[in-house]
């Protein structure tokens, strides 16, 4: 009887371990592509506080890049995407580069450029200038879809830009 209980405990532990790994995104068999998404918006400091914090406008054609490095800090992948009319961008990144598995935590996403005539100064809100690493856990993990949803990156007008220290 004790042996049966012990075997059931071992089996349950193994099943829980497999479920846990899949939940945190460390083991997803068959996934060849990871998806990255976020928004690019314009934030105008000349507006009132309420409009400034909640009245940001989407930037169509705002360019965002992803740079991934290997374990020796060499760049192994670079791509960019432009935002749509609503400011959304979505990139698909191959999970295997030159036969090696890409580690999402080694990828950095940042602002590149804005086509907007007046709202084209990148800000570091949500890491737009310095870049942001992908989170440890994907936002969406469903069947063969692995997606990392990043925050909103912001551009601002030249009038709002902080002068460089000199």
Question: What are the language-model segments listed below?
Answer:
Residues 2-131:
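Beta-strand-dominated extracellular/periplasmic modules and repeats
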Residues 113-161:
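C2-type phospholipid-binding modules
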Residues 25, 29, 156-166:
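Extracellular/luminal ectodomains of metazoan preproproteins built from arrays
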């Amino acid at each position: 009887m004790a042996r049966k209980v012990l075997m059931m405990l071992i089996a349950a532990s193994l099943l829980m371990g497999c479920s846990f790994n899949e939940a945190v995104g460390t083991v997803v068999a068959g996934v060849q592509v990871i998806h990255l998404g976020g928004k690019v918006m314009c934030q105008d400091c000349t507006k009132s506080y309420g409009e400034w914090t909640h009245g940001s406008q989407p930037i169509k054609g705002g360019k965002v890049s992803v740079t991934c490095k290997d374990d020796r800090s060499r760049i192994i992948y670079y791509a960019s995407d432009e935002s749509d009319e609503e400011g959304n961008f979505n990139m698909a990144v191959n999970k295997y580069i030159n036969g090696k598995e890409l580690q999402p935590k080694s990828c950095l996403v940042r602002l590149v450029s804005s086509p907007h005539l007046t709202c084209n100064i990148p800000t570091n809100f949500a890491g737009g200038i310095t870049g942001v690493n992908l989170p440890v856990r994907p936002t969406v993990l469903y069947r063969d879809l692995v997606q990392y949803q990043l925050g909103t990156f912001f551009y601002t007008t030249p009038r709002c830009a902080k002068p460089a220290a000199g």
